[in-house]
Amino acid sequence: MSKVTSSTLLKFKQEGTKFTSITAYDASFAAAFDSEGIDAILVGDSLGMVLQGHDDTLPVTTADVAYHTACVRRGISRALLIADMPFMSYATPEQAMTNATTLMQAGANMVKLEGGHWLLETVTMLTQRGIPVCGHLGLTPQSVHVFGGFKMQGKDEKNAQRILDEALALQDAGAQLLVLECIPAALAKTITQAVAIPVIGIGAGADTDGQILVMHDVLGITSGYIPKFSKNYLKQTGEIRSAIKAYIDEVAAGDFPSEEHTLV
């Protein structure tokens, strides 16, 4: 199978082909996901919670993400590899440039940043210097203390309009991909139709161009709170590779997320 690039995902959007993403943090799981046909793998700062045991993602460092990015890179040959930029690793454009370079040199094809209008200069700077950017709007976990917890965003008209405006602005600044997290499905659909770049949803309904889940949720090994938008595919299939295949197939068919896994 040919390598997935940002152009591949753009073609999927234009053709109406749903694509599937997942988090991974090591070579073995990444290789299994890659061989089953996952289109994009995110080395998420979620590693702070699912691997390191923290209550949120804030303690994660660029060195942490770079280490796991290098591990995942060794396990894959097809999927697009996206690396999260951790909390306070991109507070200024110059800081972002330094840390994004570290992640790209570790093997990432793209870096992901959380935020809207304040990030536009940084997105343009990175893009112009050869570092592809994925934006992230809605529930941005690095801002959990500003939000007062892991809460759905964009529920009122003012904030919904702000998220839409920021999506368009990120696209204009050069972002090639966008993640929407924990926003109303109707808003996610509006944004997906409004932008030309591919949109990946998590807790954002079924009308985004692609979906992403944390691997620990897909495999049913998450401890504590389990998000409504997640689904334990291992319980359904009994085998890891079959679980990933079921996830891919359900997204492609439009069966996931179902109403059961959609936030209102």
Swiss-Prot record:
Signal peptide: none annotated. The gene is panB. It catalyses: 3-methyl-2-oxobutanoate + (6R)-5,10-methylene-5,6,7,8-tetrahydrofolate + H2O = 2-dehydropantoate + (6S)-5,6,7,8-tetrahydrofolate. Binds 1 Mg(2+) ion per subunit. This is 3-methyl-2-oxobutanoate hydroxymethyltransferase. Pathway: Cofactor biosynthesis; (R)-pantothenate biosynthesis; (R)-pantoate from 3-methyl-2-oxobutanoate: step 1/2. GO terms for biological process: pantothenate biosynthetic process. Homodecamer; pentamer of dimers. One of its GO terms (molecular function) is 3-methyl-2-oxobutanoate hydroxymethyltransferase activity. Its main location: cytoplasm. It is found in: Cytoplasm. Disulfide bonds: none annotated. The keyword Acyltransferase does not apply. Catalyzes the reversible reaction in which hydroxymethyl group from 5,10-methylenetetrahydrofolate is transferred onto alpha-ketoisovalerate to form ketopantoate. GO terms for cellular component: cytoplasm. Its EC number is 2.1.2.11. It comes from Shewanella denitrificans (strain OS217 / ATCC BAA-1090 / DSM 15013).
